[in-house]
């Protein structure tokens, strides 16, 4: 008499973790197999390009203040909500991140605002 899959699943469902571990070992011995996970090969070539496409969070870096430091400080204050002293310290300490872990659209907007103020900025 054949045992139905449902009967096997019901029996396994009722087992404790210790009993399941013993069952796995018995399968390994009986059939000469291993329960270790199989390593799957990644996509050939272009792996770095695929990883770059999947990036969802970006960092806007202020590289240098440029000629109009006051305008850059104002832009940094608008973007970050920092106080005057904190924004000035950030601009003086460039290169520094202005915004971190933001979506692409927000990063582009922040970079444009900084560049419009005269700063050099980049998105990482």
UniProtKB/Swiss-Prot annotation:
One of its GO terms (molecular function) is mRNA binding. CDD domains: Ribosomal_L7_L12. The keyword Oxidoreductase does not apply. GO terms for biological process: translation. Pfam families: Ribosomal_L12 (PF00542), Ribosomal_L12_N (PF16320). Keywords: Ribonucleoprotein, Ribosomal protein. Belongs to the bacterial ribosomal protein bL12 family. Forms part of the ribosomal stalk which helps the ribosome interact with GTP-bound translation factors. Is thus essential for accurate translation. GO terms for cellular component: cytosolic large ribosomal subunit. This is Large ribosomal subunit protein bL12. Homodimer. Part of the ribosomal stalk of the 50S ribosomal subunit. Forms a multimeric L10(L12)X complex, where L10 forms an elongated spine to which 2 to 4 L12 dimers bind in a sequential fashion. Binds GTP-bound translation factors. HAMAP family: Ribosomal_bL12 (MF_00368).
């Amino acid at each position: 008499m054949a045992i139905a899959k449902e009967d096997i699943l019901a029996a396994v469902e009722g087992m404790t973790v210790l009993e399941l571990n013993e069952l796995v070992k018995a399968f390994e011995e009986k059939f000469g197999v291993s329960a270790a996970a199989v390593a799957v090969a990644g996509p050939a070539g272009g792996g770095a390009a695929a990883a770059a496409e999947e990036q969802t969070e970006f960092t806007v870096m202020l590289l240098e203040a440029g000629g109009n430091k006051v305008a850059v400080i104002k832009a940094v204050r608008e973007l970050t909500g920092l106080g005057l002293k904190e924004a000035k310290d950030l601009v003086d300490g460039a290169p520094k991140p202005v915004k971190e872990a933001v979506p692409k659209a927000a990063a582009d907007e922040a970079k444009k605002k900084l560049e419009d103020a005269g700063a050099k900025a980049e998105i990482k």
